A protein has these predicted regions:
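Core catalytic region of metal-dependent phosphoesterases/phosphodiesterases
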Residues: 1-64
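Conserved beta-sheet core of the metallophosphoesterase superfamily
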Residues: 50-58, 63-81, 89-194
């Protein structure tokens, strides 16, 4: 699938999830953190300052926010840099794709490079927990949570030496008084196929 077609499919899926949550969730407010990564990059090499200007993902998030601009229960937070900081209750959470963390497939997995990167970032701006994807590995290392792969094992996962994992995403609960209280998996390989109405 081409990047443009992938963005259109992702928009369709995200619009469906948002509509489902609005119609069935009885939520007063839904906060949507949006971080771009390497998947939608239009340049061969990553850019630092101008990364959002060349990101199909960043464009998609802005199109979604525009599409839902009249829905007062939705609040989009779209990163203009590789990281986005948002408070959950009084806990500062760092959201990022994760592709800016160097990892060469070492024995300790992503844990050691991620802990090192977080320690460096926390010197400038501390976060209670960092949420990341990119590495196709569902992991909870205390002050960071890595999301699994929505589609499961694939060629990229093999290239980065990721262990086989079923298609899944992380589900995290943060308690107002106790902080992170639960991390569990939402398995995505049994979901019904997407159909157009």
């Amino acid at each position: 699938m081409s990047p443009v077609k992938a963005i259109l499919l992702a928009m369709d899926l995200l619009n469906g999830v948002i509509k489902h949550l609005l119609d069935n969730g009885n939520f007063e407010r839904i906060t949507v953190p949006c971080c771009f990564g390497n998947h939608g990059r239009l340049t061969h090499k990553p850019r630092a300052k101008t990364a959002p200007d060349t990101s199909l993902e960043w464009m998609m998030y802005n199109l979604l926010a525009t599409h839902w601009k009249h829905e007062k229960r939705l609040v989009f937070h779209i990163a203009d840099a590789v990281q986005l900081y948002l408070p959950v209750f009084e806990y500062p959470i760092r959201f990022m794709h994760g592709d800016d963390v160097s990892y060469g497939g070492g024995v300790g997995g992503i844990t050691i490079p991620m802990r090192r990167a977080i320690a460096d970032w926390d010197k400038t701006k501390r976060a209670y927990c960092s949420m990341f994807g990119h590495f196709h590995t569902a992991v909870d290392i205390g002050n960071a949570i890595g999301n699994g792969s929505l589609i499961g094992a694939n060629a990229y996962g093999v290239r980065i030496h990721a262990a086989y994992e079923p298609p899944r995403q992380q589900f995290v609960l943060i308690d107002q008084k106790r902080g992170k209280s639960s991390v569990s998996h939402i398995y995505t390989d049994y979901l019904p196929p997407v159909t157009k109405e």
